[in-house]
């Protein structure tokens, strides 16, 4: 399937998947970048913290989003069900992050979680969830 005949929902999911894969790749190669984005640092009391950034924010993001890109690239063989399934699963990942951040902003407010950074984070996570979920949502509506 060429880009000119690919549904807009698939293009949106592909763009979000490319962004997510790039973020994962950057965190895998440069864990300090991933740590700065999520505003965390390895606990100096325990060894191996950088491996967690490479794994959780690097490899996991890269390959989860890579799976969406692969199903889009192979949609002529895999079919639309594969595209919907892969993109919906990763959409739920982003929706879960937004939900967790919202819960923290409500419950953990004494920890100063109600910040502009977290509000922007919720918006970004919901945007990624919507873009990645678009193929599935379009299927429900169509």
Where do the PLM segments sit?
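Cytosolic, membrane-interface loops and tails of multi-pass inner-membrane proteins
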Residues: 30-50, 104, 108-109
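Juxtamembrane boundary at the C-terminal end of a transmembrane helix
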Residues: 132-142
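Short, strongly hydrophobic alpha-helical membrane anchors
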Residues: 1-7, 141-142
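Juxtamembrane helix-capping/reentrant segments at transmembrane boundaries
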Residues: 41-55, 114-120
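Core segments of alpha-helical transmembrane spans in multipass integral membrane proteins
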Residues: 49-73, 92-96
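N-terminal signal-anchor transmembrane alpha helix
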Residues: 10-29
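Transmembrane helix-loop-helix
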Residues: 71-109, 113-119, 142
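Alpha-helical transmembrane segments of multipass membrane proteins
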Residues: 24-25, 68-72, 102, 133
